[in-house]
């Protein structure tokens, strides 16, 4: 595996803040599963995200609250089937979003996991 050198002006380790992690994952989840953007939700305001993080609310619970409040319908599920599928997201959806957005790396796995689960100690 070849590693790339750090360019001048580029941070050696640019770790996103908890709010940025939520924004990245919310954008992915809302777009992929509900066809929405971050600006379509109260999470367009960083303060709302900060309040959720400080309150220890998980990302999954925050999204599912929006789904229930606004009766959102998942757009990523194929038509009707014999079994009714839930409109809510789950931990697998969040893991897939983390992988798709590059937030599944070994060096930040635990930190991102704690942030998405509402267990980020620095927020309290």
Swiss-Prot record:
A GO cellular component entry from the record: cytoplasm
Subcellular location: Cytoplasm
UniProt-annotated stretches for the region Required for interaction with MreB: 74-124
GO MF annotation, one: cytoskeletal protein binding
Disrupted-gene phenotype: No visible phenotype. Deletion of 3 type IV toxin genes (cbtA, ykfI, ypfJ) leads to a slight reduction in resistance to oxidative stress, has no effect on cell growth.
Claim: Cytoplasm is one of the keywords in the record: yes
Region of interest: Sufficient for toxicity, toxin less stabile: 1-73
Top-level taxonomic group: Bacteria
Keyword terms of this UniProt record: Cell shape, Cytoplasm, Toxin-antitoxin system
GO biological process: autolysis; negative regulation of cytoskeleton organization; negative regulation of FtsZ-dependent cytokinesis; regulation of cell shape
Expression induction or repression: Expressed in mid-log phase at lower levels than toxin relE.
InterPro entries: CbtA_toxin (IPR009610)
Pfam short name (any one): CbtA_toxin
Subunit note: Interacts with FtsZ. Interacts with MreB.
Family of this protein: Belongs to the CbtA/YkfI/YpjF toxin family.
Miscellaneous comment in the UniProt entry for this protein: Encoded in prophage CP4-44.
Stated role: Toxic component of a type IV toxin-antitoxin (TA) system. Acts as a dual toxin inhibitor that blocks cell division and cell elongation in genetically separable interactions with FtsZ and MreB. Interacts with cytoskeletal proteins FtsZ and MreB; inhibits FtsZ GTP-dependent polymerization and GTPase activity as well as MreB ATP-dependent polymerization. Binds to both the N- and C-terminus of FtsZ, likely blocking its polymerization and localization, leading to blockage of cell division.
Free-text comment about domains: The N-terminal 15 residues are required for interaction with both FtsZ and MreB, while the C-terminal 63 residues are required for interaction with MreB.
Designated name of the protein: Cytoskeleton-binding toxin CbtA
Gene this chain is encoded by: cbtA
